[in-house]
Amino acid sequence: MMQPKRTKFRKAHKGRIHGVASSGATLAFGQFGLKAMEPERITARQIEAARRALTRHMKRAGRVWIRVFPDLPVSKKPAEVRMGSGKGSPELWVARVKPGRVMFEIDGVNQQIAREALTLAAAKLPIKTRFVARIAE
């Protein structure tokens, strides 16, 4: 699973996801992509599950680019622990995803297989997504 090799700080504030994606909103590498339509925090496990669904349906043909990276630590207190006494320890890593962000891109397969693969990947994610394709040149 993806996580940063090192960070400046161990814990982070929760924060909010405002506005729409300005960077990363268009296809940059592949011919087809999966675009987020809702703001959400996507966990490293969800990204990995979507990646596996993609590569397995494509039968390892073509190329996959993951355009989001989980760089935000989420802390959690252990079960049955009373409130207070500080913030919990880091439990998982998430990526903040804004609406309009292209999360996955693929190339080297035809449009039908790409659409099926990205639909399977979208089922692993907790947000509404849209299939996007580069206009034929």
Curated annotation (Swiss-Prot):
Top-rank lineage group of the source organism: Bacteria
Entry's Gene Ontology cellular component terms: cytosolic large ribosomal subunit
GO molecular function: rRNA binding; structural constituent of ribosome; tRNA binding
UniProt keyword annotation of Disulfide bond present: no
Disulfide bonds: none
GO terms under biological process: translation
Protein name per its UniProtKB record: Large ribosomal subunit protein uL16
Organism: Rhodopseudomonas palustris (strain TIE-1)
Gene (name only): rplP
